[in-house]
């Protein structure tokens, strides 16, 4: 309300959902209020239903796919694919292309790819022996999205596109991530976090009503210890470092 009263541009918001409850009424509300909606969906039916069953332990892929196909005719929806050990086990030379073609067929045009971290189901976490296959998946994924840029209606990966734009603009950044710098997250309990990955780890930015208390986030982002990255030419272009992982396990120097 204060933004509209002062002719201030409304901020953008984002939510991540499994998509089960999305409909045109909700999407219309989100569209009018600058809320970007991202749907968690892990590629094809077999992979998605292996890890994302509904509350009744039933498969969800077909229902979500049907909703997304209808809604993307009128609204922009983003995808979020989370790589987990099921992707490692299912990998073949054609599998990465098949995962993204499945998403594209639903009407998605933009999204990102994450990696599972400290899952409640430890069987889904990646293991050291998975690294070789993970590298192949990353290679195939980058090849896929570069080829997509040459098509009439490409599917974009937000992170790959962001790095390319930084290169084209010669735009280097002091921060590896926007967590707590250009973005914040609010939980359903009203706790304010730098990003969703800080959830359930006792972190609260404690932003007051009259001023920004930023000492906490400064302690996280001002003391990066990614020593192995010091001599890398791409350190100010890279967006792979995660402040949340650092906060959760500083001694392991995870990045």
Label for each model-derived stretch:
Residues 187-189:
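Short, acidic, Ser/Thr-enriched surface-loop or helix-capping motifs
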Residues 46-179, 183-185, 203:
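Radical SAM enzyme [4Fe-4S]-AdoMet core and its adjacent flexible, acidic
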Residues 133-167, 192-240:
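C-terminal accessory region of radical SAM enzymes
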Residues 249-255:
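Short microdomains enriched in Cys/His and/or Lys/Arg
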Residues 184, 202, 236-239, 245, ...:
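Cys/His-rich zinc-coordinating "finger/knuckle" motifs
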Residues 1-50, 54-63, 81-98:
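Canonical radical SAM enzyme core domain
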